[in-house]
Amino acid sequence: MSGRLVLVLGDQLDRASAAFDGFDRGRDRVWMAEVAGESTHVWSHKARIAVFLSGMRHFRTALRHERIDVDYTALAATPAPGEPPSLAEALAASLAEAKRRGIEPDALVVVEPGEWRVRQALSAAAEQARVPLEIRPDRHFFSSVEDFATHAAGRKQLRLEYFYRSLRERHGVLLDDGEPAGGQWNYDVENRGAFPKTGPGRLPAPVRFEPDAITREVIDLVNVRFAGHPGSLDAFDWPVTPADARAALDDFLVHRLADFGRYQDAIWTGAPWLYHARLAQALNMKLLDPRDVVAGAERLYRAGKVPLEAAEGFIRQVIGWREYVRGVYWHFMPEYEHRNALTADRPLPSFYWTADTEMNCLRDALSQTLRHGYAHHIQRLMVTGLFALLSGVRPQDVHRWYLAVYVDAVEWVELPNTLGMSQFADGGVMASKPYCASGAYLDRMSNACRGCRFNPKVAVGADACPFTTLYWDFLARHEKLLKTNPRMGMQLKNLARKDAAELRQIRRQADGLRDAAG
C-alpha cells in the first residue's frame, strides 16, 4: 500500500486546495492526466485546449520543484497506441498499473470537480477499482454547495440579490458598521453607460503573457493534434501560472477597474477587452483566489482610487454571480442540463463557428471569439446569446457552443449562465425575465449598427435588422407564457400596438431568417 493518490484536475490548479491537506510527501502522490476526450466532448477552441494543458504542465512542474511525486500523463501530437480517451479510463489504467506493481493507493482524494459528468466518471472509476474516493469541499469559493442548498430551502423563487447580500454580510465585504457601503447594496443602475459617439478613446491594453517554453510546446501540440478545431492560437497570451494571474489582477485593478462599472454593459466593435477584467479564466482554473480579487477591489475603493459603483459592480460579479451560478448548477443538476422552457428546437446557426454573417455586432463578437477564445459578458448575453434566444435555438446546442469556445468555460459556471441567464431555458430560476431585446438595444449600447447594412429600427423588408424582426416574433410566439411575468408588461404592451397584418409579415420574415441561418 502506498498512501493516497491525490487527483488534480485541469480546473483545480490551486496549491492551497483542500486536496493537499495532510499530504505526506513520503507516501502520497499526485495524479494528473491530459486526455483528448476533455477537448473533444465539445468541439473545443484551440485556445481553450492550450490554456488548460499549459496550466496543468506548469502546475506539475511547480509540484515537482517541491519534490512532490506527480504521476502525469501527457498528450502527444500523435495519439499513442492504447491512449485512454477519457479521464475515467486514464484513471482506471493508472490504478490497474499501480495494482500490478504493488503500489495501489489506500485511497483517492479529489476536490469537488467542476462538472457533474466528471464527478460521476471519477466515482465510477474508483468504485470499479475498489479504491475509496474522498471528495473534499472546494474552499476556493466563498460559499459551499450546502450553503446554497440551505439558502434555497423553502424559497419559491431564487434570486441573486439575496444570496449576494448574505455573502457580503458573512464575509464583511463593502460594509460600514454592518451596513452596505454608501447605503445601497447594488449600484447596477449607475453601471449601464454607453460610450459617446466618438468611442471609448484610448483604452489601456491588458498585460500580455508571452508564451514560455512550456506554453510554446503546448501550442505546437494543439496546432497538430487538434488542427481541425475552431479558433486560432496566433494571439494566445493567457495567464497560465499563479504569478501570471496575480499580475493580470494587479493590471486590471490599477488600469481598468475605475471605468469598469460605468461601461460594463457597453460594446465597441474592434475593442474586445474595453475595461473588462479578463480574470474569469484564471479564477476558474483556480490560479487566482477570489478573496484576493475582492479584497483588491475594495482596497482601491477605500483608498479613494475607484468609485464605489465600479468596486461594487465588479465585486458583485465575483462574490455574487460567480457563487450564485455555482449554487444553481449543483442544486439542480443533473436534470438542469435538459431544461427547455421555451421548447426551442432550431439548430445553432453554422456562422457561429465561422463569423460569416452580415450582422456587424455578431460578426465582431464571433470573430474575436474565434481569435481569442473570449468575448465579454454583455457580448455573450446580448449579442450571441440574444440572437440564439430570439432564433429559437436548442438551448443544449447553445450550451455546448459556449462550453467549447471560451477559455474560461467550465460547466458549473457556463451552463447556468447559458441555459438560465441567456436562453431562459430554466423558466426563470436564474433570471427573473428573458433577456430579450431588439436591434434598438444594440444601437443604443454599441457602435455596431453604424455602417451595418441592416436598420435596427425596421422589422420587415430587405433592410430590416434580424434582431428586430426576431424580437417581435419572439414576443408574439411566447406571449401566453410571457404574460404571466410582470416584468414583461411594457414589452408586451408595445407588442399589442402591432396589428395582425404586421405580425404576419414579421412571422414570415422571421421564419425566413431562421431557415436561412439553419
Name each model feature, range by range.
Residues 1-75:
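N-terminal beta-strand-loop-alpha-helix module at the start
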Residues 38-39, 169-282, 460-468, 479-518:
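A eukaryotic "domain-start" boundary segment
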Residues 44-98, 107, 112-114, 155:
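N-terminal Rossmann-like or analogous alpha/beta NTP/dinucleotide-binding catalytic cores
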Residues 33-35, 132-144, 412-420:
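A generic structural motif
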Residues 16-20, 42-44, 82-84, 118-123, ...:
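A short acidic (Asp/Glu
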Residues 12-14, 37, 115-116, 140-141, ...:
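Short, solvent-exposed loop/turn segments at secondary-structure junctions
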Residues 9, 16, 21, 266, ...:
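C-terminal catalytic domain of photolyase/cryptochrome flavoproteins
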